[in-house]
Each structure stands twice: as C-alpha cells, then as structure tokens.
Amino acid sequence: MQSKNMIVASSHQQQQQQQPQQPQPQLKCPRCDSSNTKFCYYNNYSLSQPRHFCKACKRYWTRGGTLRNVPVGGSYRKNKRVKRPSTATTTTASTVSTTNSSSPNNPHQISHFSSMNHHPLFYGLSDHMSSCNNNLPMIPSRFSDSSKTCSSSGLESEFLSSGFSSLSALGLGLPHQMSHDHTINGSFINNSTTNKPFLLSGLFGSSMSSSSTLLQHPHKPMNNGGDMLGQSHLQTLASLQDLHVGGNNEDMKYKEGKLDQISGNINGFMSSSSSLDPSNYNNMWNNASVVNGAWLDPTNNNVGSSLTSLI
C-alpha cells in the first residue's frame, strides 16, 4: 500500500512541473494607468519594496513608496545656465576707454603762455593789454606772433610801471611816483628788439640774488635827484619768468647758464663795493644809463667787466 501511495505522489509532482507556470498579473502604472510594466529589482535589495518600470511613460515607481513627479530623463535636475547680456560688458569697456582718452598724456605739462586765458589785472596790468593777446616783453620773439599790431615798447613800459606801482601798494616803503617819474628812461626800453629779451632776462636774473640787500635800503639817490631803481623792484617780474615754456631744451639750458653767469658777476660787483655810499650808486647808474641809444659805454673804466657782459 505504501509503495502505491509514493508512486501516485511522484506522478502528481511531475504533472505540476510539466504544467506551465502562470505569469504573475502585471501591475498598472500609477502615473499613466498602463499595464505595460515590468518588474526590475527590489529597492535596496529588500523584498518589501519591489521596483517596477513603466514602458509607456518610461518612468520608475516603487511599490509602497511615494511617487515623485520626475520627467523622463530627469532634465529638471540639470542647472540651467543663465546667459548674461553682453551690453553690460560693452558699456564698462566704453567707460574705461573714455576715461583713458580724456586724461592728458602729461598732467604736469604747462600749456603755452599765450593760450592761458588769465585776465591782465591778475598781473597788475591794464585792460588794454588783453587786446595784445598777452604778448609780454619777457617772451622772446619766436614765442609771440610778429604780426600783432600792438607795440612792444608800450607793453614793456606798461608792464614795468604796473610792477613798480604794485610794489608800492604792498607797503614796502616805495614811492608811487616811480612808475612814471624816475623809473627807466624811454630810450632804455626803445632799444633794438633783438636785445630786449636778453636785456630783461639779465635784469631779472640779477634781481633775485641781491633783492634782500636792496630792500634794506629802498631809497637810494639816482640821477636827476630821483630815487634809485633797485633790483628788488623787478622781483615781482622775475616770478613770471618761471611760467615760460621753451620750445627747445638746448636753448633754455644755454640761456639759464648765461643768466647764472650774469647774476654771479653782478653779485661780485655789488659785494666788492666798499660801502653803501650814495655816490657809488650814482656812478653805477650814470654809467649804465642810456646815452644816445647805447646801452653801455665799454670805454668807461669805472664800470667793471660784469656790466659789459650785458651787451
């Protein structure tokens, strides 16, 4: 009996094995309700959370888990690069270029003296000097226009007289009548035009070194009973000499050397004088005054070689 039961059980098992296994019912996609799904794997290798895939919407879901609104391919997770407008970069570059172009090449460079729009009263001159375009006598002829109609002699006399009157206003004890009474003879100014810049520059160079000595004795007798024209009177005019701009460096160096030599000679002549006797100043200015259109008399032995170098 037992053998018969064992044979029946074995035959029953073989029949079950021969019968095809019925496939498990496919789950519907929770997103698109499609039955075209398949089992993929167990989430985290756990039998409690199997993971399925929907072939219709091509997205995954986990049984027993929450659904995430994830698009196909997960493109929303990629960082989108925002393109900046190119106008901002162009505006910054243009502002930098404009600032560089507006700045001068040399900020310390002094512009031409004639182009400076200073009022003539700034230098103590009258209003009619502006019509001459600020052509001062200290500027050589190559810096000024020779076609101007204003006379240089009138400018020089106006320039010198206004400089002397401004000194009297400073309270230095200088008389106001020196501007027209006993300043400089007219023939002294109306000399040859080629020697005017050199003559005035020589006077300005000598006034800088001996101004302190002459300021202590502002009243010195001169020819014809007038006051002596001290070198300190031209000190204000010498300050304007620093405003000049030369066109040739070699010419300026040559003129500076000549000015230093002239000022040194005059200082030596002044220091060699024995005393401040008024007669010595009378002799000096009588010899240096203009006689018949001549600036100096080189045959006179009373005047040292320092004054003959001014010719």
Swiss-Prot record:
Residues 1-12 have a biased composition (Polar residues). The lineage of its organism: Eukaryota, Viridiplantae, Streptophyta, Embryophyta, Tracheophyta. The keyword Zinc applies. Transcription factor that binds specifically to a 5'-AA[AG]G-3' consensus core sequence. Residues 13-26, 85-107 have a biased composition (Low complexity). It is found in: Nucleus. Pfam families: Zn_ribbon_Dof. Keywords: DNA-binding, Metal-binding, Nucleus, Transcription, Transcription regulation, Zinc, Zinc-finger. GO terms for molecular function: DNA binding; DNA-binding transcription factor activity; zinc ion binding. Zn(2+) binds at C29, C32, C54, C57. It comes from Arabidopsis thaliana. This is Dof zinc finger protein DOF1.4. A zinc finger (Dof-type) spans 27-81. PROSITE patterns: ZF_DOF_1, ZF_DOF_2. It comes from the Eukaryota. GO terms for cellular component: nucleus.
